[in-house]
């Protein structure tokens, strides 16, 4: 992303900012922004978040089927459409906590009768164990040497990123912030993907979108946008799916 007149040039994965930026399930699923108190003392946005969670079929379905976040169904839809997760493929999941995408990736790629994990999940926050998933806790922005050490030079068939900064409510700033994360995920994908591999990242439409997409098209044979039905109706998120990595 080229510099602009927006005053938001920070690295959003550094520890000092970690508490403010969720990983997977970023449509305010886990921690609502609270602003104004009602007469009963409850924040209005908090009340709206609770109501939305209670009425959300994917929240209920995730609990029923054992997924850690409703965002798992977004990856399920992406995979139904693009078939990126297949038995024996190796997956790198960036910003994995709490683990919804890692669960889906594991289910679709696990090798029968093998003890080798097919999924490596990475997050600055901790994450509970998942079968067939190796977890690395580090800051993928500032701890690149540690990430290299943990990955031990291995390559992946799929790199996933559902990372997004928590919304500040300003469309241009939110867009600039998420593009910064998209570029970080892209750079990791370019380093760790196998030839013909796939890359998926969340983004928001905006000023830097086309520039980012062009940077992806340089390295991939097929680049598509996809909006899962499980995305909330009021969410402006969309997923960029890049296939056939050329190196």
Swiss-Prot record:
Gene3D superfamilies: Vaccinia Virus protein VP39. It holds the Pfam family FtsJ. GO terms for molecular function: rRNA (uridine-2'-O-)-methyltransferase activity. The keyword Repeat does not apply. Its main location: cytoplasm. It catalyses: uridine(2552) in 23S rRNA + S-adenosyl-L-methionine = 2'-O-methyluridine(2552) in 23S rRNA + S-adenosyl-L-homocysteine + H(+). This is Ribosomal RNA large subunit methyltransferase E.
């Amino acid at each position: 992303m080229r510099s602009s007149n927006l005053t938001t040039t920070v690295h959003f994965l550094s520890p000092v900012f970690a508490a403010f930026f969720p990983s997977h399930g970023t449509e305010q699923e886990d921690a609502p922004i609270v602003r104004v108190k009602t007469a009963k003392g409850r924040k209005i946005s908090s009340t709206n978040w609770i109501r939305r969670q209670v009425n959300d079929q994917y929240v209920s379905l995730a609990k029923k089927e054992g997924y850690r976040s409703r965002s798992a169904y977004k990856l399920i839809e992406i995979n139904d459409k693009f078939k990126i997760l297949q038995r024996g493929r190796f997956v790198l999941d960036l910003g994995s906590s709490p683990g919804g995408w890692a669960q889906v990736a594991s289910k679709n790629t696990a090798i029968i009768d093998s003890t080798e994990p097919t999924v490596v999940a990475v997050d600055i926050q901790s994450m509970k164990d998942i079968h067939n998933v190796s977890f690395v806790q580090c800051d993928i922005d500032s701890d690149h040497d540690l990430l290299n050490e943990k990955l031990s030079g291995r390559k992946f068939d799929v790199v996933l990123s559902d990372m997004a900064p928590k919304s500040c409510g300003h469309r241009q700033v939110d867009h600039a912030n998420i593009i910064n994360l998209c570029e970080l995920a892209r750079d990791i994908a370019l380093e760790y993907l196998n030839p013909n591999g796939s890359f998926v990242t969340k983004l928001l439409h905006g000023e830097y979108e086309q520039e980012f997409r062009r940077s992806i098209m340089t390295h991939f044979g097929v680049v598509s946008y996809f909006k899962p039905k499980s995305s909330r109706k009021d969410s402006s998120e969309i997923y960029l799916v890049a296939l056939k990595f050329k190196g």
